[in-house]
Amino acid sequence: MTHELDLTLRPDWQEVEQLNQQAMTFLTDTGMAHAEVDTYTMVICELAENSIKYGDSSQPICLNVKVRDKSVCVQVKNKVRSEAHGHLRELDQTLQWIRGVQDPYQAYLERIRELSREPIANARSCLGLIRIMYEGHSDVDFVLDDDTLNVSALSRSR
Amino acid sequence: MSEHNDVDHNATDTAAPVTAAAPANHAEGAIKRGGQTTAVDLQCASRYSLWLAYRDEPPHPATGAFDSLTFETDAHTIALGPCQVLEDADAPDGHYRLVPMASIHDFEKLFQQSRADVLDLAARNLPLILQYRNNIDPAFRTFVGDVAYDISVYKELFDRLDAEYAGEPEPVREVIQQGLIRNTGQEFIDCLNAHVADMERIIDNFEGEQHSQHGYYLRKQLWGELLTAPFMARTNLKPRGYIGDSEMMQMCYRNTYEGDSTFGKLLHHHPVSSAAAQAVRNRRPLVAAMAGDYADRMGASADNRMRLLSVACGPALELHDLLNSRERCQQVEYSLLDQDDLALGEAAAALGAVEKRLQTPVKVNYIQESVRTLLATRALRERWGEFHFIYSMGLFDYLTPPVAKAVLSKLHALLLPGGEMAIGNFHVTNPTRRYMDYWLDWPLYYRTEEDFLALTEDFGDATAWIEYDDTGVQMLLRIRKATT
């Protein structure tokens, strides 16, 4: 059985608190264990925050969550401005590198080390996404389709 | 000779960097010894030391060990633990050199970039990393101990034998090494195979992240030995920042004994002779045959070229199989896409070899772009045109379902009516799966037939089916677009 949540959010930080509540209620209603509810609520909110941070502030964010017996898939879509494309190239490289490290905790530590060694003007943390991979037990991936950014987090196992 | 177009980088604007205000290059602080605190002025002296001047009466002695130093920069309050104050001939007048003994900050970064970076940061995470072994299954721990023991015995033996005949002329060394590989080497390979089979049995009931934790533990124990094998070193270290790069593919294609020692050569050959590597080799003639068959069916010619797109082309060695005659070379227009300029260079070399051998040019476009951002190119069709045949062999194994679906949809939109696609993905039953995960640190997205076909469920105008290579490991999603 698939449980599905579809939401359209304003790209506004104030939306995150309400989203947190909505996500918890939805996930709890699927019959998920309490710890999993916390985990995937974090995943949903991190992805939404990422969209607010890098997305076009005049365009809405579409969020979709599918909970199946063996997987949870969170997808967030929103428009991005062309200025963000440079960041997406970095994100692409970072995610491919993390995917190549099977243990996300090692990637998390390594990324923190790398960030501390970068000049502050270049610092683009991606830490929220790495947190999803490590604490959220999910694989993060993205694709840019025209100017719509589609970021997804797929649970590695339930 | 070639009709090669320049690499299309699909350039987009990059974000302008944020300009940070220039930080001050000095600070005021307080240094403590016993119960005595003394005010100090500080400047960066070197990456890991400071120039220190006492603002008032210096402590006695002015140099030597101190308990702590605290100071403020523009962005941080820094508290150092024990440190040493030294006389230094290079110090400015009235200054000493201060060197921390713990929390060893990078002072150049701190003062010049307002960034706190500590040399011994990694040591702070040690307890967490050491705790990792508490999660390891006892049977697996015993297994890894046995593997490490056996491998070290074989390594020592082969290294000793290598040293014994090292002074022989090269042809003699080569023949002796071939003999070792064929005889004692086979015993070592049998031993490895037995251990891999044991591992499969022990981890059979593991779930999810247990696999990544246990794989990490195994690699940690065998790290030195794994690095002697060029293939294993490459899959584990990922020198290009991603898994499955074109050199790894080339190693699979070569399927030879490579390395600096007999032991390294044997360990290198073990994975490149596995079922998964055989599947990589099998897909090369397979995709060439599919594309060649399409060219024949459409009656491709110099005036009616078959337009081919290879996505994540890697070294594109299948060009040797497809472009096997002057006529075939004149029937096609190739577009080769890869994120990695080194891979495109290797593909260009493969094409150059074909052109040289057949003494005819091949029409080709090179596109350097990641599949995750290539779809950002508005009007892909206008930019690159439409294609009769699109294939991608080693890409979808790394894409999550949502991204795989989006990429496939865009590629499908680039197909001409009646055009075909061949998309590779390893099957979930790959017998080498856990060996790749644990020993090679090479995780893939494995798919079932159902998973793979589900990526096409929104294609109203297409027929989709699944084919396999001889090993059954390499699954191919075949798609044919409707003719109208």
Per-segment meaning from a language model:
Chain B
Residues 1-149:
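Structured alpha-helical
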Residues 99-270, 275, 290:
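N-terminal accessory segments
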Residues 315-329:
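Conserved SAM-binding loop of SAM-dependent methyltransferases across substrates and taxa
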Residues 377-390:
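A short acidic, Gly/Pro-enriched loop at the edge of an enzyme's catalytic core
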Residues 405-417:
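A short glycine-rich, Lys/Arg-flanked "PGG" loop and its adjoining helix->strand segment in the class I
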Residues 418-425:
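Conserved beta-strand signature within the Rossmann-like core of class I S-adenosyl-L-methionine
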